[in-house]
Amino acid sequence: MSTSSHSGDCTAVPSNSNGTIILSAIGVVFGDIGTSPLYTLKEAFSPNYGLTPNHDTVLGILSLIFWAMMLVVTIKYVAVIMRVDNDGEGGIMALTALTQRTMPFGSRSIYIVGILGIFGTSLFFGDGVITPAISVLSAVEGLEVAEPHMKAFVVPITLAVLILLFLCQRFGTERVGKTFGPITLLWFIAIGVVGVYNIAQAPEVLHAINPSWGLHFFLEHGWHSMFVLGAVVLAVTGGEALYADMGHFGAKAIRHAWMYVVLPMLALNYLGQGALVLSNPTAIGNPFYQSIPDWGLYPMIALATAAAVIASQALITGSYSLSSQAMQLGYIPRMNVRHTSQSTIGQIYVPTVNWTLLTLVILTVIGFGDSTSMASAYGVAVTGTMMITTVLMIIYARANPRVPRLMLWMMAIVFIAVDGAFFYANIIKFMDGAWFPLLLGVVIFTFMRTWLRGRKLLHEEMRKDGINLDNFLPGLMLAPPVKVPGTAVFLTADSTVVPHALMHNLKHNKVLHERNVFLTVKTLKIPYAANSERLKIEPISNGFYRVHIRFGFMETPDVPSALMCSKDHAGIDFDPMHTTFFVSRETVIPSANRGMPIWRDKLFVLMHRNAAPANAFFRIPGNRLVELGAQVEI
């Protein structure tokens, strides 16, 4: 398993035990794709596609589902993309940062790759809204099969489960998380056993493993078969999680879990549902629950709901983690991040993200009303993210001379053709619900781009009005102000310019501390900064130091802890009780005559005003912080 050092520690943290890592991976990584049998085959034969559940059509759809799992998950993700890691970390943001590192500094390509990464991240957040909604709703819809009169209660029960899930987030998942693996493993075993039971009733369904049935389906239905791919892709939703969670569990554990547990059980269940439909075509209304014996229906509903909650939890936790990475890389404003575990670094809770997701999930459930309507919206976010991941992987592989060119272009053609077909099959359902995740993606993309552009304009304005630090200090020492005991740490984004906070301190307080540190915090495009690279201390003149602290994008920046290591690096001993942190708090004034359009200026001002204060984000004690204001027009 990938390990790291604590954000500010001087020593590394030992590796976590990997004794139960495969079981843990089953619980976290495969919850989303594991609940896909609840709705995939049901959606493929919904009235939206006009298919008749006859022998050839059922085998054709099953063949497409099986080979979608093989091509997209087994070959693309497990065999190829999971070989590309950013110091052990995966996911679209890690891949974006890794790809940008292969490009010349300041090149246009870095900007284009950044745009792709931001939009892929935006679509992932859209996925984080739809997955909890469709997973829990599909599980609870089993009540309609058991008791048809319960249909009116499906949406209220779904909302109750989801609201309770989000309300519990602030307590963390350290204790209950230990049950995720066993429960999800039980889920996979149960659906596999049910699949075997139904296959025994119609064993000819096993012929669907032959890809010729999928090809026959395409030949028979022509262009109409492209529409059906919009339902088939539901079988691979959650495939991106294999790559995104690679840093938590390691590629080997995820590969073993997929090949030996998840893939066989999913295949058995899909084939079992198909066998049921071959024997009883009327079961196509809800083949998953219809395939279960009456005595096991209620236990399966309970188990399915638990599996759906776990799948939702994985997406929620992933949204927190992705938000934290985006904050570190400067894509979104700083937000309050709470750590919910004293023993596990990565377990965090982001209240703003939590309540935003809950609001959107509630609106999604109420707006769509059932899983069939929601399925039309689900695929766009998933296929869009998958396609962007493929493009980024190809761009990265092009820069790697060890990758044979012929193999690279063959992979590019196959993967882009498959991803493109799935994306097209979903985008043509724009008016049927595909607009929803695209709208979410565009809104989030706009926020992220506005924040990036606004921060750049803000830094340019402050630098333009700034004074060169190396020229300023000699003049200051010609008529030095009164010195007071202790250390002053001035946080600054540009270490070559005099911090606004220092200028205001001299102007209003007319004092200087014995030791003055100009501190710049930098986030690297790698997950974790090595301890040897954490601190860079440069003495400028007597009593003045320029300090750079580096954190990886997966780390929580703990500035005081990092500074405590300075004695080991340069003999500077930071005493927290005698150190004062000075931060400049800018008041941004929008202007119609420069920078961005005025509406984006106002949006940036709103985000900047609501960003978490620096002391909370950098874990600086509030009683050691002095904030000094400055007005900046952009």
Curated annotation (Swiss-Prot):
GO molecular function: potassium ion transmembrane transporter activity; symporter activity
Protein name as catalogued: Probable potassium transport system protein Kup
Keyword annotations: Cell inner membrane, Cell membrane, Ion transport, Membrane, Potassium, Potassium transport, Symport, Transmembrane, Transmembrane helix, Transport
InterPro entries from the UniProt entry: K+_transporter (IPR003855), K_trans_C (IPR053952), K_trans_N (IPR053951), Kup (IPR023051)
Segments traversing the membrane: 21-41, 61-81, 110-130, 148-168, 180-200, 217-237, 258-278, 296-316, 348-368, 377-397, 408-428, 432-452
Pfam families found in the cross-reference section: K_trans, K_trans_C
Subcellular location: Cell inner membrane
GO cellular component: plasma membrane
Coiled coil regions in record: none
Keyword DNA-binding: no
Membrane topology: Multi-pass membrane protein
Catalyzed chemical reaction(s): K(+)(in) + H(+)(in) = K(+)(out) + H(+)(out)
Summary of the function given for this chain in its UniProt record: Transport of potassium into the cell. Likely operates as a K(+):H(+) symporter.
Taxonomic placement: Bacteria, Pseudomonadati, Pseudomonadota, Gammaproteobacteria, Lysobacterales
Cross-referenced PANTHER family: LOW AFFINITY POTASSIUM TRANSPORT SYSTEM PROTEIN KUP, OSMOTIC STRESS POTASSIUM TRANSPORTER
Sequence similarity: Belongs to the HAK/KUP transporter (TC 2.A.72) family.
Keyword Oxidoreductase: no
Gene, per the UniProt record: kup
